Curated annotation (Swiss-Prot):
This is Protein Gawky. Residues 208-225 have a biased composition (Basic and acidic residues). Residues 1-205 are annotated as: Required for interaction with AGO1. It comes from Drosophila melanogaster (Fruit fly). The UBA domain is not required for correct subcellular location, gene silencing or interaction with pAbp. The RRM domain lacks RNA-binding properties and does not bind RNA in vitro. It is not required for P-body localization or for interaction with AGO1 or miRNAs but is required for silencing. May play a role in protein-protein interactions. It is found in: Cytoplasm, P-body. PROSITE patterns: UBA.
Length: 1384
């Protein structure tokens, strides 16, 4: 009673005035879950005497505890102990904590409360005899770790038990925080029973109220006994009553969460009874407490050394300590919500600051705490804690806002170790059982797995607590080790332990650690840790808030108008570096500090931010850091890939200044070393500028903010760092050195930053693979591939951005006013391509830098007027007129031709990420090296009309190219016709590429006309050119855009006409022979395989773009049919194609929606293309294009390599065989097995009847062959082996899988097709060409059935093999040879 009297206010003291009626009764908590509750409550009983009555019952323990209990405990009416009302009735134990309360060990004493349905076993475990709350009471037996005096509550063992018990209860616990027992309390006691104030509530635990109180889960609740009870009653939930509890708005949630949490925590708690309060106890508690308040948990923390805790309170709760020390368990400093523990961490004083971060975060998490997800609470999804107690569903439930202290007994630290765990732990640690979660973080890692077992028992404490482990857990700062409590967390290094507390340490450990508090994540681990730790701890011990607030940096920043809280966070994060802090603040201001302060909650927030830096996103506050961050980018835009943070949400990233990211990055790959998870983290880290950006994409607002804020502009330091990293990247070949000479837009800088970040992470991931160790190779490889894709995407985006920017500058060299506009355009494009993140970083636009490819778009001002006038430059610089409109996002292209269409294509491509080739370049056209030309092609592809416009633009080949204007190119269609033509001047149609200009001209129009080109999507992989247009395909350049065509054509044309003329300097790789030269591009096609598919409409967009009707000589005889459906009958399609001329080969890739037909002549192919384009077949409109050889090769390489056989006549057999083999080899999988060469299959196994195609074509055997091995389908093909004679296609079952596809036709004679497994279906010996399998014309001896479908048997249904007209064997052989070359 005395203590109650001492309490200064209703809140503060749980023992509210006796005279007060204890509003609690007046508003008994809705019985919530306990029917008995009401009786127990006996709200009527509240006459103010409850308090003393409770005390009496408690055996002289300050009834106050109970009183408060009643205050709100009472409310619950269904108290475990039959809280107040019951108390009156008598069973003290039942009432309130009594039993539990009794004795600090409480272990046995554990609450006698059984009545409330919670029976506390001696173990302190709540037996819960039907705890009203459903056990809300988790019997939070904190089993304190220490059991120290503080632990009053159940002894440590009690904790464990309690934990278990609690956990059981936990389910309900939430519902009723009051149920939560003081963690320490062995028994689960209704929180109501327990005194809020008293923390003691357990009654068990120590007569020393304060101890109890510390421990008391209600502790937090303690605040405002009356309020609590009143609140409880009024609120109807424990939670409610502790509004302070971190906005228990979450209460409901918390309750829900609590239960879940309880469960999860239980396990934790159980695992380490000793674990310090934070340990299992808290876990337990957390289950309950979290249930309840978090504070309760805090109690739990308290348990760990509640006293210590109070002692540790240290800065946080100065007032509090005294009360605690006062042994007024009930004393509430108003932070009770936060829970004493919080108190410890920062219950009162700064709880908002640091603790909050902790507390709030935890609160946020609180609900979530259990789950680790909670930790992420803000993140919510993250569950990073993953490892953490997954069982704690609540965490997710709760939400970022769930500020309630959180489940973990520690309130903020909801055992959740899980919550927190996620942080660094997530990575491997997390599994730690979450336990580690908290503290461990860094250790966690250690503990991580290892610890997990032990859970480090201290979840919170974790690790650091290590040292203090038990003690500290959260609440105790004292244990310094404690994550929370102490920032000291001595082990800063462990810091992790600090998980929370440590910001830096965490980082170290894994960002995670930082995640929470580690504001400093970025900052040096140790330092930060220290600083942060202090701060973090909520105690703000080291760099505690007081120190920060007294610092000059703080004053200066505050005087500059930044919010104090933000300044404090920023300084913590920046390690008191005022410059960095100012950068962060400015950046945040744009976000309204949203990201930062998004959780206003307190340092935690910034700590998280840090983390986010390291792990993935401020926004996450709770670091998203899990491995996923790396994934984050995927979801939003390419940039997201960059920032693992994307997960966290755009805000945080943005908040995180690029600088921070950069800094983080500079620190090295924090996570990478860890391994895949590290990689994940690193990806988060990788965010860098990009992170902001990516998030921006994620959160448009964020990007907007960035754009809005000059803050977002990188600081000088950031830029310097970025410059250094760019130089390194240039040395590494990731970036062209030209980027150094180009002006960079802000967007480009962001992209570069992301690129660098990804490169760094890629390297780290690769190193981790090299290093080996306990790294999951698969995960690392996935991460590596992800990084590579991101890098490629970023390069493409950078190229596109620079191209647009440069283009715009060119258009208005003098006025860079348009730059913003330009950027907008890019944004637009980007949006198309999913590069939204690019948009909005305009602030950086001013920055200049170029990527080598980007150099194509040399800023007019930048290079000098002379360059602009040089045709070459103009080539490099896209024509602004057209480009700006159509191509705002287009990647830089070599030719100056505008790539209007290209733009659209480009964006698609980018979004698809298809174009892979050039690091920077878009890789528009497969064949061409020059990007610009692709636009022409694209134009063609996109619309027939466009080509015209493109043509018009370039009509005059001779016409000079003017930088700001689209180069008109010459009117002359074929280069041959234009004497003045130069590579850069030609605007001819892509067809001009063809060695024979005439054809090219002819096709150029058709190509343009052909809608199929429209989808230039095909990303032909060429980096330079999108090159969907196959029209020009012939030119290696020509692929590029039509506009470019002139150029490409110029180049190609000449090339075609005279090999001597090569592509422009940078594009030499694409030889003049687009088919072959482009071959290299096909690699570019990387995206291509996809790309070409993608561009399904665009078709392969081979360089040739057969639009031109196969203008390219090489490609002209090929016909690419796109937009097919798997329902189309292969044989029917083949027959349809054969109507326009004999097919040298037919490769249906119906599953990919395309088919390749090779005619003996280009004329036939062109004819077929014109006839079949837009032809309606089965429920689809076929788009026919004339791909270049390169495109064909790319397709065949990337698609199931089951080119239908290039059938070679059986006779040529021997000959062909040889060729076939080689060709096949090239195709390897391609089922070609020319007759007899099964071996050709790439496997060679089916050598089959070599030349003897007809021979009997033992080829069949190939089945064995490895045909199957290399291509499944191929095998089939092999079987099909054409051997004409036997036609036994037997097809050894060979790839039956493909076989269906393949249905090889045997030679005309047998005509067997091998569909289906090895059966030769023979479709009758009839060699009807129709048969899919036999489909080969009768003549053709060989039908190679190529199953083109290595991917899909169905696809191939139509036998690929197409028999060649018999008369043409020689041609066929030649063609086969070519085909094989192409395949190669």
């Amino acid at each position: 009673m005395r203590e109650a009297l001492f309490s200064q206010d209703g809140w503060g003291c749980q023992h509210v005035n006796q005279d007060t009626n204890w509003e609690v009764p007046s508003s008994p908590e809705p019985a919530n879950k306990d029917a008995p509750g009401p009786p127990m409550w006996k709200p009527s009983i509240n006459n103010g005497t409850d308090l003393w009555e409770s005390n009496l019952r408690n055996g002289g323990q300050p009834a106050a505890q109970q009183v408060p209990k009643p205050s709100w405990g009472h409310t619950p009416s269904s108290n475990l102990g039959g809280t107040w009302g019951e108390d009156d009735d008598g069973a003290d134990s039942s009432s309130v904590w009594t039993g539990g309360a009794v004795s600090n060990a409480g272990s046995g004493a554990a609450v006698g409360v059984n009545q409330a349905g919670v029976n506390v076993g001696p173990g302190g475990v709540v037996s819960s005899g039907g705890p009203q709350w459903g056990q809300g009471v988790v019997g939070v037996g904190l089993g304190s770790t220490g059991g120290n005096g503080s632990s009053n509550i159940t002894g440590s063992s009690g904790v464990a038990t309690g934990s278990s018990g609690n956990s059981s209860n936990a389910g309900n616990g939430w519902g009723d925080p009051r149920e939560i027992r003081p963690l320490g309390v062995g028994g689960s006691m209704d929180i109501r029973n327990v005194e809020h104030r008293g923390g003691n509530g357990s009654g068990a635990t120590s007569s020393d109220p304060r101890d109890i109180r510390m421990i008391d889960p209600r502790d937090p609740i303690r605040g405002d006994p009356r309020g609590i009870s009143g609140r409880l009653n009024g609120t109807s939930e424990m939670w409610g009553h502790h509004p302070q509890m971190s906005h228990n708005q979450l209460q409901g949630i918390n309750k829900m969460v609590g239960q879940s949490v309880a469960t999860a925590s239980t396990s934790v708690g159980t695992s380490g009874s000793g674990i310090g309060p934070g340990g299992p106890g808290p876990s337990t508690v957390s289950g309950n407490i979290p249930t309840q308040w978090g504070p309760a948990q805090p109690v739990s923390v308290g348990v760990s050394g509640p006293k210590d805790m109070s002692k540790q309170i240290s800065g946080w709760e100065e007032p509090s300590p005294p009360p605690q020390r006062r042994s007024i368990p009930n004393y509430d400093d108003g932070t009770s919500l936060w829970g004493q523990q919080t108190r410890v961490p920062a219950a009162s004083g700064h709880w908002k600051d640091m603790t909050d971060s902790i507390g709030r975060s935890s609160h946020l998490m609180r609900g979530q705490s259990q789950t680790g997800g909670i930790g992420i609470a803000g993140v919510g999804n993250s569950n990073v804690p993953v490892g953490a107690n997954p069982s704690n569903p609540i965490s997710s439930v709760v939400g970022p806002q769930a500020r309630i202290p959180s489940v973990g007994g520690v309130q903020h630290k909801p055992d959740g170790g899980a919550m927190w765990v996620h942080s660094g732990n997530v990575g491997g640690r997390n599994n730690v059982a979450a336990v580690t979660t908290w503290g461990d973080d860094t250790h966690s890692v250690n503990v991580g797995a290892p610890s997990s077992g032990s859970v480090s028992s201290n979840n919170w404490v974790d690790d650091k607590s290590n040292s203090t482990l038990a003690q500290n857990s959260w609440s105790d700062p004292a244990p310094v080790g404690v994550s929370w409590g102490n920032k000291q967390s001595k082990p800063p290094s462990n810091s992790a332990s600090s998980g929370w507390s440590t910001a830096a340490g965490v980082v170290d450990g894994v960002d995670l650690g930082s995640e929470w508090n580690t504001h400093g994540g970025i900052i040096g681990k140790s330092q930060q840790q220290q600083k942060l730790a202090g701060l973090n701890v909520g105690m703000v011990n080291v760099i505690n808030a007081e120190i920060i607030k007294q610092s000059k940096q703080y004053r200066i920043l505050v005087e500059n108008g930044f919010k104090k809280e933000d300044v404090e966070r920023a300084l913590v994060i920046a390690n008191m570096n005022i410059e960095e802090a100012a950068d962060m603040l400015r950046a945040n201001s744009s976000l309204s500090m949203d990201g930062w302060r998004r959780h206003d909650e307190s340092l935690g927030s910034y700590a998280d931010h840090n983390s986010s830096t390291s792990s993935g996103g401020f926004a996450g506050r709770y670091p998203v850091n899990s491995g996923q961050p790396s994934m984050s980018f995927p979801h939003n835009n390419l940039m997201n890939n960059m920032g693992g943070t994307a997960v966290t949400g755009g805000n945080n990233n943005t908040n995180m200044t690029a600088l921070q990211v950069q800094k983080y990055l500079n620190q090295g790959q924090h996570g990478v070393a860890v391994g895949p998870q590290a990689v994940g983290n690193s990806s988060a880290v990788s965010v860098g500028f990009g992170q902001n950006t990516s998030n921006a994409a994620v959160a448009g607002a964020a990007s907007v903010n960035i754009a809005a804020n000059t803050n977002n502009q990188p600081s000088g330091q950031q830029i310097r760092m970025l410059g250094q990293q760019i130089q390194l990247a240039i040395h590494s070949g990731f970036i062209s050195s030209q980027i150094l000479t180009q002006p960079l837009t802000q967007t480009t800088l962001n992209l570069l930053n992301q690129l660098l970040s990804n490169i760094k992470h890629l390297q780290a991931a690769q190193q981790s693979l090299t290093r080996g160790g306990n790294v999951n190779p698969m995960a690392v490889n996935v991460a590596i591939s992800k990084y590579k894709q991101q890098i490629q995407n970023l390069q493409n985006q950078i190229n596109a951005q620079q191209a647009v920017y440069v283009k715009q500058q060119n258009m208005q060299p003098t006025s860079q006013q348009q730059q913003p506009q330009q950027q907008q355009l890019p944004s637009v494009h980007l949006s198309n391509s999913g590069n939204d993140y690019l948009r909005g970083h305009d602030a950086i636009n001013n920055l200049q830098s170029n990527f080598s490819e980007l150099n194509i778009n040399k800023p007019s001002g930048y290079q000098g007027a002379s360059n602009q006038q040089s045709r070459l430059n103009q080539w490099k610089l896209p024509v602004l007129d057209k480009e700006i409109n159509s191509d705002s996002t287009e990647f830089s292209r070599a030719p100056g031709a505008t790539k209007q269409n290209l733009t659209a294509n480009t964006s698609n491509i980018n979004s698809l990420g298809l174009q892979n080739d050039s690091t920077w370049s878009t890789g528009r056209s497969i064949g061409d090296g020059w990007p610009d030309p692709s636009s022409d092609n694209e134009n063609k592809d996109w619309s027939v009309a466009q080509p015209t416009s493109a043509a018009t633009a370039y009509t005059d080949l001779v016409q000079e190219f003017e930088p700001g204007k689209p180069w008109k190119g010459s009117q002359i269609k074929s280069i041959e016709d234009d004497p003045s033509i130069t590579p850069g001047s030609v605007a001819r149609s892509p067809l001009s590429i063809n060695s024979t200009p005439k054809d090219a001209d002819i096709f150029a129009n058709t190509g343009k006309n052909s809608p199929t080109d429209l989808p230039p999507l095909s990303l032909s992989s060429s980096t330079w050119s999108f090159n969907p247009n196959q029209n020009y395909p012939s030119h290696s350049w020509s692929d590029n855009s039509q506009q470019c065509t002139a150029t490409s054509e110029l180049w190609t044309s000449p090339l075609n006409k005279s090999s001597s003329r090569g592509p422009p300097p940078g594009l030499t790789a694409n030889s003049n022979k687009s088919a072959n030269s482009n071959a290299s591009t096909p690699t570019t096609i990387t995206g291509g395989a996809n790309g070409w598919l993608q561009p399904r409409s665009g078709g392969v967009q081979t360089t040739n773009t057969n639009w031109t009707g196969g203008n390219t000589t090489w490609g002209s005889s090929w016909l690419l049919l796109k937009n097919l459906t798997a329902q189309i009958d292969g044989p029917t399609l083949r027959t349809l194609c054969m109507q326009h001329g004999p097919l040298v080969s037919f490769h249906p890739y119906l599953n990919q929606g395309i088919a390749l037909c090779k005619y003996t002549t280009r004329e036939e192919a062109n004819k077929a293309q014109m006839a079949l384009n837009n032809c309606v077949l089965a429920n689809t409109t076929i788009f026919a294009e004339s791909p270049s050889e390169n495109e064909v090769q790319s397709i065949m390489q990337h698609l199931p390599q089951t080119p239908s056989s290039t059938s070679s006549s059986g006779t040529s057999g021997g000959n062909v065989g040889g060729v076939g083999t080689s060709a096949n080899n090239a195709n390897s999988g391609s089922a070609a097995c020319l007759s007899g060469n099964n071996s050709g299959n790439g496997n060679g196994s089916a050598s089959g009847a070599g030349s003897g195609n007809n021979g009997n074509s033992s080829c069949n055997n190939s089945a064995a062959g490895g045909g199957s091995s290399s291509n499944n389908t191929i095998t089939t093909v092999a079987n099909s082996n054409l051997v004409g004679s036997s036609g036994s296609v037997s097809n050894s079952s060979g790839v039956t899988a493909n076989s269906s596809t393949v249905s090889v036709v045997s030679c005309t004679a047998s005509g067997n097709s091998i569909n289906g497994a090895g059966t030769a279906n023979s479709s009758g010996s009839k060699s009807s060409a129709n048969n899919l399998a036999s489909g080969q014309s009768s003549a053709s001896n060989l039908t190679n059935s190529t199953n083109s479908t290595w991917r899909q048997t169905s696809q191939n249904q139509a036998l690929q093999s197409q028999s060649r007209p018999s008369g043409r064997e020689a041609d066929f052989d030649y063609i086969s040879l070519v085909y094989s070359i192409v395949d190669d």
